[in-house]
């Protein structure tokens, strides 16, 4: 997959396994391990220094001779909660402020009950104010098995 960035001006991103839902059953590959594997197969690569590529948590590498970049989104091995600017709206209208936790707000109910734009905005701002400081993905399964953690799979959440 990484070789696709060699011949195309496309940035290939690897997303670390998120231990939520069914993802808890699998062992993910850390960014360091993937860098080691890629280092055996690819020409020399180095951290990308330049204009930001997008506005998310991905960090990129330049690879000699490649048209595109190789990037990593590593929520477990390189926790980026302090810089997280993401929220997620599920197809059921539920606003999630962190993928690990089941907490959030039911925006569908606000809309269906006739809530005004101002009410909807207030509910969203309230959810954002309660956005957790971080996740406990690396903290062991005992921290992930309480009733506050997400039980749904990424496909059900929208990822």
Identify what each model region corresponds to.
Residues 70-72, 97-98:
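Short capping micro-motif at the N-terminus of alpha-helices
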Residues 78-159:
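Radical SAM enzyme core and accessory elements
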Residues 1-69, 75, 109-111:
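Radical SAM enzyme [4Fe-4S]-AdoMet core and its adjacent flexible, acidic
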């Amino acid at each position: 997959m990484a070789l696709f960035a060699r011949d195309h001006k496309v940035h290939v991103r690897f997303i670390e396994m998120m231990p939520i839902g069914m993802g808890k059953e699998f062992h993910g590959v850390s960014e360091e391990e993937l860098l080691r594997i890629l280092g055996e197969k690819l020409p020399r690569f180095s951290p990308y220094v330049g204009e930001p590529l997008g506005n998310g948590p991905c960090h990129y590498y330049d690879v000699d001779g490649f048209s595109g970049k190789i990037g990593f989104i590593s929520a477990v091995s390189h926790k980026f909660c302090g810089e997280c600017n993401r929220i997620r709206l599920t197809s059921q209208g539920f606003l999630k402020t962190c993928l690990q936790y089941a907490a959030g707000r039911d925006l569908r109910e606000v809309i269906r009950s006739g809530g005004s734009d101002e009410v909807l905005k207030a509910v969203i701002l309230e959810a954002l104010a309660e956005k957790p400081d971080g996740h406990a993905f690396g903290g062991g399964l005992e921290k992930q098995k309480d009733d506050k953690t997400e039980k749904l799979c990424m496909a059900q959440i929208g990822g």
